Every structure is written in structure tokens, then in C-alpha cells.
UniProtKB/Swiss-Prot annotation:
This is Xanthine phosphoribosyltransferase. It comes from Streptococcus thermophilus. It catalyses: XMP + diphosphate = xanthine + 5-phospho-alpha-D-ribose 1-diphosphate. It is found in: Cytoplasm. Homodimer. Xanthine binds at L20, T26, K155. Its EC number is 2.4.2.22.
Length: 192
């Protein structure tokens, strides 16, 4: 997605060998860009029968919400912290965050997923694939089907895509980062 790649080049900060800071996605969200991202995902998956979009809080919510709006289906986001209102029928998975270097237990209320659901997972970044893997575990535990994993930005130099594709989950990434070179992003051809 050229619009996204241009924004990454203009506003992205490469931190070290494998971290890209993008505040338009993770802090002060650019809703117009997120709306375009949502439309692209919706166009790609409009004929697949998607019934739900699933994301993990927090940065995955914005692109997932706009994909949900464009697909006209409900969105569910996995919570990273348990609260007292989620006290029964909870599906959980352990998820390691590459950026934060911590493991979180993410959860979704089981009543929101059924065996009839065809799910599109939407996430902001794909690095080692652990967030998507955790969501897949929860979705399949509910008996629902993962139709595809939609990624805003993929770090192609890490093994997340291979992990998901080896398990037969289609991955669609709007921007694919091949490497960082001299503090700059080098792109690989995106899926869309």
C-alpha cells in the first residue's frame, strides 16, 4: 500500500536493528490513514464471508475497527489485562510482545465467537507471529475458523509470516519491511 509506505518513510523512526517507531499507528492515530487501511482490508476480504474481525489491544484496534466498519461486521478485541467484569466463559492465550519484551495473557469472552464464525485477524505489526498465534489459539478453541491474518506492517526479516504460513494461515500485509539500512526502511513487495 503506497500511501502507508510513504507515511512510514516520512514519519518512521528506526530504533536499533529491528524496531520501527510509528506514532501515527501506536500513539496519536491518523484516523484517515486507518480508514484507508480498513477499506483495503475490506476490499481484499469482501467475498470471503468474514463474520468477525479480531484484534489485540491496543494498537491493533484502530485498523481493525475501520476494517470492521468497511466489512459491516462486529469487531472483538482481546484484552491484555483481566478485569472483574470478565469472570466466566473466558478464552485465554499467552502472547509474547517482541517490542515490549513481555508475555501477556490475552483474553476474549467465549460468547462472542461461535463455530459459525469466519474470522479476519487484524494486527498493527507482524514480527515473530506470537500475537497472531495467540489469537488463532483462542479463535480455534471457540470452534471458529481463521480465514486470514491481515497485517498493517510486516517485519519480513523476522519469522512471523513463515510461522503462520507453515500452519496454513493466509497472511496479507499492506507494507513489508525487508530490512533497516543506515537508519532507513527498505521495503519488500507488499501483498496488496
Amino acid at each position: 500500500m503506497k500511501l502507508l509506505e510513504d507515511r512510514i518513510l516520512n514519519d518512521g523512526d528506526v530504533l536499533g536493528e529491528n524496531i520501527l517507531k510509528l506514532t501515527f499507528l501506536t500513539h496519536q492515530v491518523d484516523f484517515e490513514l486507518m480508514r484507508e487501511i480498513g477499506k483495503v482490508f475490506a476490499e481484499k476480504f469482501k467475498d470471503t464471508g468474514i463474520t468477525k474481525v479480531v484484534a489485540i489491544e491496543a494498537s491493533g484496534i484502530a485498523p481493525a475497527l475501520y476494517a470492521t466498519e468497511a466489512l459491516d461486521v462486529p469487531m472483538i478485541f482481546a484484552k491484555k489485562a483481566k478485569n472483574i467484569t470478565m469472570n466466566e466463559g473466558i478464552l485465554t492465550a499467552e502472547v509474547y510482545s517482541f517490542t515490549k519484551q513481555v508475555t501477556s495473557t490475552v483474553s476474549i469472552a467465549s460468547k462472542f465467537l461461535t463455530p459459525e464464525d469466519k474470522v479476519l485477524i487484524v494486527d498493527d505489526f507482524l514480527a515473530n507471529g506470537q500475537a497472531a498465534k495467540g489469537l488463532i489459539q483462542i479463535i480455534e478453541e471457540a470452534g471458529a475458523h481463521v480465514e486470514a491474518v491481515g497485517i498493517v506492517i510486516e517485519k519480513s526479516f523476522q519469522d512471523g509470516r513463515a510461522l503462520l504460513e507453515e500452519a496454513s494461515y493466509p497472511v496479507v500485509s499492506l507494507a513489508r519491511l525487508e530490512r533497516f539500512e543506515n537508519g532507513q526502511v527498505v521495503f519488500k513487495e507488499a501483498d496488496i
